[in-house]
Swiss-Prot record:
It is found in: Cytoplasm. It comes from the Bacteria. Cu cation binds at residues 16, 83-84. One of its GO terms (biological process) is response to copper ion. Binds 1 copper ion per subunit. Involved in resistance toward heavy metals. InterPro entries: CutA_Enterobact, Ion_tolerance_CutA, N-reg_PII-like_a/b, N-reg_PII/ATP_PRibTrfase_C. It holds the Pfam family CutA1. This is Divalent-cation tolerance protein CutA. The lineage of its organism: Bacteria, Pseudomonadati, Pseudomonadota, Gammaproteobacteria, Enterobacterales. GO terms for molecular function: copper ion binding; metal ion binding. It comes from Escherichia coli (strain K12). One of its GO terms (cellular component) is cytoplasm.
Length: 112
């Protein structure tokens, strides 16, 4: 295993939800084509509960898990936000503190 360093090649995981599989696949295809993410995992069937404008909402969504680097995260977030149908999409960045050396090397090589 490799300890990730605090650098531009450090890996991060970006979480984003989409309203349906078609939207999630379109967003994933866009960020992969632009080499802003190395991998997108789409998990349909997520249920999100939240308050929006004072009302409790419940939505069935697709959870997107995107793998990228610190140096690509801002461009990835901007791309997702500009192409996302939600007014305020879920965009969360989680640091990767450990990972398999071969996987992290592949991740870095897969990005622009």
């Amino acid at each position: 295993m490799l300890d990730e360093k605090s650098s531009n090649t450090a890996s991060v995981v970006v979480l984003c939800t989409a309203p349906d599989e078609a939207t999630a696949q379109d967003l994933a295809a866009k960020v992969l084509a632009e080499k802003l993410a190395a991998c997108a995992t789409l998990i349909p069937g997520a249920t999100s509960l939240y308050y929006w404008e004072g009302k409790l909402e419940q939505e069935y969504e697709v959870q997107m898990i995107l793998k990228t680097t610190v140096s690509h995260q801002q461009a990835l977030l901007e791309c997702l936000k500009s192409h996302h149908p939600y007014q305020t999409p879920e965009l969360l960045v989680l640091p990767v503190t450990h990972g398999d050396t071969d996987y992290l090397s592949w991740l870095n090589a897969s990005l622009r």
